[in-house]
Amino acid sequence: MIAPPGGTDWRRLHPLTPLVRFGRLILAVALITVPYLESSRSPRGKFELFYPVLVWAALIGLGTIGAIVSWAVTRWRIEGADLRIESGFIRRQSVRIPLSRIQAVDIVAPLIARVLGLAEVRVVSAGRGGEHGRLAYLTAQEAPAVRARLLALAHGLSAETPEPPAVPLLHVDNGRLIAGLSMRAHVLVPLAVMVVAIVSAVIAPGPGVAALGSVLTIVVGAGVALVRAFNEDFDFSINEAGDGLRLDRGLLQRRHETIPFGRIQAVRLMQPLLWRPFGWWRLEVDVARQHAPRDGSDQGGGQQARTLVPVAPRAHVLWVLARVFPDAGIAPPAGAEPPARALLKAPLSYHYLAAWYGNRYVYARTGRVQQATVVVPLAKIQSLRLRQGPVQRWLRLATLDVDTAGRRWGASARCRDEAEVQRMLWELTERARLARHAPAPSAMATAVAPA
């Protein structure tokens, strides 16, 4: 087939794509069927096992045929100024992604795909409501080449332009990662409840044993969450390139993601209570329109796409913060604390509340058990909202919410003097307007990494 001017010929996905897509179902069927094999030793057991196995075999056969047909009718090419992907047998679908709208190109390699030497190329574009263009699957050697080609064309360069080099910023130690994840509240609280339940079962065997079963389910759930988080953030590394920050992570499913600097709406520095003796912090980013695909294939990526540093010492976190938001400091100046009467409204968190702003960023600090500081560039502010409940009105206090184009969270100046909030509302509105018309600072300035 002759390619159009500026385009390429139609290309298909790798022939082993159906095996990767249907491999999970085959494994699930195997795990369900194995327990029934024990009953097949008796003649009656063999008869009872025959029909379930037949049904599962039929489902696997139909699924395999469907996966093969889906692969056969899926093709893609670069057509002019668009990436075009056609798929579907009964319901034909043709997706066109303008190359100029591409914001990031990620590479995802699930376990089965990695074993077979395959990887998925996931194209994130603006204005698609969280949907991604997916090329699943290509060879592990072809995927980076396709990624480099798409990024070059998206930036108006020649298709043969190599991918810009990346500078290593930070690698998260896996030992510190598992220790930090284990000291989170959603892990320790179920374990503490489990200990109490065991003691209760020893003291009062009747009701205590009954409660132990329910608690055990909660503990297992916490363990699964811990293993999943470790699996997703294993061997976490951050690299910096001209197109943004590149994140490499994952144990079973390896992910190579890119977060463009321009899409970062806000950052949040967090420190759980039990991390404080070790000086560990966590850094998260809120990215505009960063959603998981509708088919759920992201494997938790909707949450992990906003994790920039899972756990690291304070100096390392501030180093990465400086690469994202240059000249952003998180030390509150004098007068950043709320008035003393705010202690009546927020007695537990009063000593951690603070809010301030400068020429480029607005800051808000909150927290009781877990400290959190949010940094929002003035140029990213979408709206400002003043909130004042009945208790706040009685105390002459108010809260100012700073909204961005992100989907996760924003900054909140809580329990401030109502006159101060009115002044902040006017000043931040004017500063945000000026910041949107000012040239953006470069995040690629030369710097020295912390020791």
Sequence positions of predicted segments:
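N-terminal basic, Ser/Thr-rich segments that initiate or prime the first beta/alpha elements at protein or domain
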Residues: 1-451
